[in-house]
Amino acid sequence: MAMRVLFTGASSALGSRVLQQMLESESYSEIWCVHHRTELAVADERVRVIDLDLTSDFDLKDIPTPIDLVIHFAARTHAPDPEEYFRVNHQGTVRLAQAAHARGCRRFVYISTRCATANAGAYGQSKLAAEEELKTFAWQSLLIIRASEVYGAGGSEGIDSLISLARRWHITPMLFGSSGIEFAPLHIDDFVAIVAGAIASQKEGPIIMELCGPEDLSGPSLAWALAKRFRALPVPVWLPLLALCLRAGRQVGLNLTAPDQTERLICAKTSSARGADAIGDIRF
């Protein structure tokens, strides 16, 4: 029987590609996509749009019952105010779960991060808090997907920002100074294929899927890979000094990164390429 789905973050770089993959299947009769700020440009009669703000009280009475599945991509990934992470990623996720549960939904897919740990700064802590609270609901199926650093969408954050810097200016930062600096770059094509497949074959019970790229890279290893591909010059960057400069900049109103960015970079991750449940095929 085809499912009625509620999909948040469907206009994001990752969510939009997973949505397109899902639309190739006949398993979904309706996909209700949440509209908040970015317009959704999808031409398919099964796609409906609903206005929703996760930071405000809402219900889902505009969606017919039952809602068979919620896919929750929407999140705040970079914020100058740490509380904003919790308003969206934690409290907003709980609101969504409560509203969906009230409309008969018993299957939930939550896109989390391998930085969902207590020492990862406000972003990781907010995602971990959401995970823990989702586990308290009576779901038939709860799938939590903890992904590593996804690249290849042409975005302006994370690995994509380093790729853009190396391609355009032929320089790349070589981060060192902490044993916690480790990347497991996951290509967006691998992410989409694995996530769409996991959604289609969602098993009963609470399941946490650790999803990483095929290799673990240190800061220097990542820099040399970018240097080789784009003929870029690796520029050594000692992380403690960089963190000090960023903090000093924030004191005078210069916010070049989110305050928790360094903590997120060096925190202990929930998994690595060596121990993930699912591994991408495309090497960085």
PLM regions and their residue ranges:
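Conserved Rossmann-fold NAD(P)-dependent oxidoreductase catalytic core, especially the SDR/UDP-sugar
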Residues: Q91-A129, T136-F137, L142-L143
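A conserved pocket-lining segment of Rossmann-fold NAD(P)-dependent short-chain dehydrogenase/reductase
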Residues: S164-L186, D190, I194-A198, E210
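N-terminal Rossmann NAD(P)H-binding glycine-rich loop of SDR-like oxidoreductase domains
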Residues: V5-S25
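NAD(P)H-binding glycine-rich loop region in Rossmannoid oxidoreductase-like domains
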Residues: R48-Q91, R95, A99-H101, T113-A118
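Flexible, glycine-rich beta-alpha linker
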Residues: A118-A122, I145-S161, I181-E182
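SDR active-site strand-loop-helix element
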Residues: T8, V34, V70-A74, F108-R114, ...
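Mid/C-terminal beta-alpha module of Rossmann-like enzyme folds, strongest
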Residues: G197-T257, D281-F284
